[in-house]
């Protein structure tokens, strides 16, 4: 009995550390959703040297949340080829409404909160809405969640 009292605690501790080391890590994100003024948003989108994919989304939007992993994957694939992906949160609750989703999913592109004003300015009628921007001009608007293959093709076309 005395033997178990000395041997059992180190064994339990070793097993606990072993179990914890196999726990999958949460996605590490350094993206902080910040408020953006309309003029600054225009600067980002109207950059003449940029091929951008701008994602209008909201935390409460199920299709937006479902599409984010695809966008994260495509951003990884194309960011070194000149794609600039920008997320625009249209939540009424401010930047903090989208932050938990950005952290949980490990979003790897900047996300800004633009609020209700951007809904009217960019004529967003449904979410998600993606804007393909080339040389400062919106060349295509994609409304609704789309497949990875569809978006991949659109991004390849944009980068040509």
Which role does the model predict for each range below?
Residues 31-52:
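A short beta-strand-turn-helix
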Residues 82-96, 107-116:
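Thiol-based oxidoreductase modules, predominantly thioredoxin-like and allied folds used
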Residues 49-52, 56-60, 126:
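Short pre-active-site segment immediately N-terminal to redox-active cysteine/selenocysteine motifs
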Residues 56-73:
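Conserved redox-active cysteine motifs that mediate thiol-disulfide chemistry
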Residues 102-134:
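Short, internal strand/loop/helix patches
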Residues 53-54, 85, 130:
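Hydrophobic beta-strand anchors of alpha/beta hydrolase catalytic cores
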Residues 125-126, 131-160:
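Non-catalytic, surface beta->alpha helical segment in thiol-disulfide oxidoreductase systems
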Residues 1-35, 141, 152, 160:
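N-terminal targeting signals for export/organelle localization
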């Amino acid at each position: 009995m005395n033997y178990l009292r000395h041997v059992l605690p180190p064994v339990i501790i070793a097993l606990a550390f072993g179990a914890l080391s196999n726990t999958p890590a949460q996605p590490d994100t350094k993206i902080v959703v910040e408020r953006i003024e309309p003029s600054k948003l225009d600067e980002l989108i109207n950059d003449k040297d940029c091929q951008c994919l701008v994602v209008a989304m909201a935390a409460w939007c199920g299709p937006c949340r479902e599409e984010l992993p695809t966008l994260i994957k495509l951003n990884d694939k194309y960011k070194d080829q000149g794609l600039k992906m920008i997320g625009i949160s249209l939540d009424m609750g401010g930047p903090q409404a989208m932050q938990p989703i950005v952290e949980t999913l490990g979003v790897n592109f900047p996300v800004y909160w633009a609020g209700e004003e951007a809904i009217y300015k960019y004529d967003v009628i449904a979410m998600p809405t993606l804007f393909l921007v080339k040389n400062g001009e919106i060349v295509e608007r994609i409304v609704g969640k789309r497949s990875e293959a569809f978006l991949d093709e659109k991004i390849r076309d944009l980068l040509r």
